[in-house]
């Protein structure tokens, strides 16, 4: 089952700083499939500019590595990227996956060619996609 590649984009604010929110549209069939029951957040801190947004160079790096990871996770049907929050010196990628262990395995495999990255990953069971 393929995820839509249609997204909405919104500007918001968090802790007085600008926040860019991207959310994936038309995921009902994937949500209702019961396959992706674990909510997984990957948080990637960056230096940012004076407003807490990534610099152009940081944006290129975040986009490149995020796309590599998203493609691998979705090709292997291990996780679906559902939302991205960028601001306050961190990029937060929200996924729904089959398991935290499988997600971690693919992250390690995908990023093995790079120096250690300052990412943090958290996961929780959320079969109804309520978070």
Where are the regions a protein language model picked out?
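Helical (often loop-to-helix) elements that flank the catalytic cores of nucleotide-handling enzymes
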Residues: 101-116
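Charge-rich, low-complexity segments
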Residues: 1-82, 89, 98-104, 131
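Residue-level signal for the start and early helices of compact helical domains
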Residues: 31-35, 86-87, 110-112, 120
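Conserved short beta-strand edge segments in small beta-sheet-based binding/regulatory domains
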Residues: 112-131
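Noncatalytic linker/hinge segments flanking ATPase motor cores
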Residues: 80-87, 122-126
């Amino acid at each position: 089952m393929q995820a839509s590649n249609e997204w909405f984009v919104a500007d918001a604010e968090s802790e007085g700083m600008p926040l860019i929110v991207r959310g994936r549209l038309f995921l009902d069939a994937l949500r209702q499939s019961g396959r992706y029951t674990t909510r997984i957040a990957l948080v990637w801190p960056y230096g940012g500019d004076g407003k807490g947004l990534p610099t152009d160079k940081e944006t290129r790096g975040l986009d490149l590595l995020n796309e590599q990871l998203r493609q691998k996770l979705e090709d292997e049907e291990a996780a679906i990227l559902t939302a991205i929050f960028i601001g306050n010196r961190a990029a937060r990628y929200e996924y729904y996956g089959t398991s935290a262990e499988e997600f971690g395995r693919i992250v390690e495999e995908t990023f093995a060619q790079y120096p250690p990255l300052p990412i943090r990953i958290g996961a929780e069971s959320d079969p109804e996609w309520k978070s």
